[in-house]
């Protein structure tokens, strides 16, 4: 089957990009590709059989129909207007046309200098591309909306970060790379007609059912807000901290995008800060819902030329509703509740208080809880708490709540084990794969990718364990 590419963005939004070609790396070579995703997208295996160079995966060649562009956008970074930003090291190669008529962006990250590189070098490093590939695939298999990773290329091109590292490229796929920052760019340039063109493009390609509706813009922004709310609820329930929730890193489609200084919770710490550059803790774990709302408010401001204030406020309310509804549903599933009862939040918050006090592992606590037997007063989870009396009191109340459900242990455990993963991408697991890859050993990278495809299967090895001492509180930054 021949791959078919189109260029809707390039053809329909001429003010939003610069056309240019990728700049290949020195002695580039393909070290990993996503075989399952490639099969789903009918990408010929021969494209990955590159023995001389890195082909399209390293920006050395283009596939028929590709029309590369670097997109321009602006944004608020750490709550401050940063002005023009844009694709400083990434290039949208083209949009794959799928069988159902939809499209999929092929975005090459680390593709070289663009007009939007500012003071950067246009490059990505092996460390950051490995982290993003692992994180995006981990999130996908956890059921959380995300961009996807298709391939990684490394090279002999030296790139200076905190130390000198190997230049690399990541092929990232997404239904769209449209960001809140695209709208901000033209709003602050006082070009409202281009803001509206962006909204029209989004509706035409991603919500075509509303194209002819008189209230199409109201419906669209309300859905953007709702998707954002559901995404943040998913992050909070799985224990994911994005680390750099600038408006230019927010997806119009409600996807997790731009994996940098992210982190999955080890110990339960609601104030967890993944990004060591976030000195004020703006993007700490428990502040993510508030930041997402703030970002939506910035987006809403750009839409005031063609959406009434009342409609914008209704959409922002929809964010709160979607967030709380999804969060409640997810947490009840994690606790094994099939019905909603008024004291559920009390029980959940009591557990969180216990976990925070004891430094309990977030992922392992919920996974162990999912093996609870309703009639048994004992639990393997008990041994992980120092204050056994406090745990026993909570566990008695929890089992009493389970007895109000007309559901047997097997069905409840099955539900809980389908939403409480045994494995998440802890920073130390990613770092172990990175350390090996930087020495030329890609086995751990491939192994970890395979394991992350089955996060809900119990394991008795270190992929499901707490981090070793060296792996606790690893510092990551935007260069990660």
From Swiss-Prot:
Catalytic activity: L-seryl-[protein] + ATP = 3-O-(5'-adenylyl)-L-seryl-[protein] + diphosphate; L-threonyl-[protein] + ATP = 3-O-(5'-adenylyl)-L-threonyl-[protein] + diphosphate; L-tyrosyl-[protein] + ATP = O-(5'-adenylyl)-L-tyrosyl-[protein] + diphosphate; L-histidyl-[protein] + UTP = N(tele)-(5'-uridylyl)-L-histidyl-[protein] + diphosphate
Superkingdom of the source species: Bacteria
Residues of the active site: 248 (proton acceptor)
TM helices/strands, residue ranges: none
InterPro entries: adnlytase_SelO, SelO
Binding site for Mg(2+): 249, 258
Enzyme Commission no: 2.7.7.-, 2.7.7.108
Binding residues annotated for ATP, in chain numbering: 86, 88-89, 109, 121-122, 172, 179, 258
First-tier enzyme category under EC: transferase
Pfam family, one: SelO
Cofactor dependence: Mg(2+); Mn(2+)
A GO term for molecular function: AMPylase activity
Keywords (A to Z) from UniProt: ATP-binding, Magnesium, Manganese, Metal-binding, Nucleotide-binding, Nucleotidyltransferase, Transferase
Primary role: Nucleotidyltransferase involved in the post-translational modification of proteins. It can catalyze the addition of adenosine monophosphate (AMP) or uridine monophosphate (UMP) to a protein, resulting in modifications known as AMPylation and UMPylation.
Sequence similarity: Belongs to the SELO family.
Name of the protein described by the UniProt record: Protein nucleotidyltransferase YdiU
Source organism of the structure: Salmonella arizonae (strain ATCC BAA-731 / CDC346-86 / RSK2980)
